[in-house]
Amino acid sequence: MKLHADKLDTQSVTAYGEGWIAVNGQRHTQSLVLASSGQLVPWTCTRFEDLTEAHFSMLASLMTEAPELVVFGSGSKLRFLPPALLRSLMGQRIGVDTMDTTAACRTYNILASEGRRVVAALLIET
């Protein structure tokens, strides 16, 4: 599916499909973290079952100012995280919204186009 963002001065998800996500037209086939402040970094996890607290604790440091919200894309289906994995983010009063990865792509684009401080952690399972 192709997506179009209203705000062009930030990274945005421009398309996605099974096993890939395109950010600003560039296709990615591995999990990634995308911040509305412009950062795009690989995320070192390939399976939901392998996620650790360390995967989430690094998300707050991507932006100069802490994000308001982390949108977590859990893969092809919605799966909720154990609260212990989110301890670091919750301790910093950063909200976490969990959804499947395609919904997370759409939600990230909407929030980023509104100028919100948002980070998307998008799991692409291999």
Which residues are covered by each model-predicted region?
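Conserved phosphate-binding catalytic cores of ATP/NTP-utilizing and phosphoryl-transfer enzymes
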Residues: 107-113
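Short acidic loop-to-helix transition motifs that present clustered carboxylates
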Residues: 101-106
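Short, charged beta->alpha transition segments
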Residues: 53-61, 107
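Short glycine-/small-residue-rich flexible loop motifs, especially phosphate/cofactor-binding loops
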Residues: 18, 83-86, 108
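Short active-site-adjacent helix-start/loop capping segments
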Residues: 42-43, 78-81, 107
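Non-catalytic interface/targeting segments
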Residues: 1-54, 113-126
